């Protein structure tokens, strides 16, 4: 059984723990998620099963959509509500000023990852160094904030809720921290929910509790190709598919498109390839 599972992750559990429970329930040989959610976060987690794990790289690079709440007036060492408060501020939350500040965080920006993150420094995870009290210096990386919308603003509680679509490599925790810094009153991420990965919605997901209690959990496993919704497809005959399965490139006529494609032998999905200049090259194969 090879495929993908859409789980609505609950709060208070790591993404790795979710994967292990799913793997045990399905008695799968291999399983892996396509982008971690912190324990404090809820929402969409894509878990790939067995041979489908070969396609993880394509999901990791997809944009993600989040709804999140920022608590202003303080900063924490982890940039979220689970961390230790390291700085407090007396200033008020001005909603009009907040709206203006958001303009600086849309589009292509430089963002420094949180010290408590999985980024590596000389071969070691940043969070490993941070937990030991060592100074963590991470370089800013270029990310894209495709959209950033203010959903609500509560000056009395010093909280605001946002909706954002962010490119791969972006951290909502850093976004919350940076917005607070720009306002001059500090801020940290209080809550986070992942709503979408590319065109895949959390509304399509099953809760972890429902999945684990199911007597037929296999019914929730989807063909992995059904999740590549914006990638066009190329259908090959048996001879052409045989060449691709041998790792060879083939010429494709009547296709002006260039980029990633789903490859099918008749109606059977066999993998992801790249089409360029009329030449189809295999990238990852299911068989």
Curated annotation (Swiss-Prot):
Catalysed reactions, semicolon-separated: uridine(55) in tRNA = pseudouridine(55) in tRNA
Top-level division of the source organism's lineage: Bacteria
Intrachain S-S bonds: none
EC numbers, comma separated: 5.4.99.25
Top class in the EC scheme: isomerase
Active-site residue list: 38 (nucleophile)
Family stated for the protein in its record: Belongs to the pseudouridine synthase TruB family. Type 1 subfamily.
HAMAP family, alphabetized: TruB_bact
Record protein name field: tRNA pseudouridine synthase B
Encoding gene, per UniProt annotation: truB
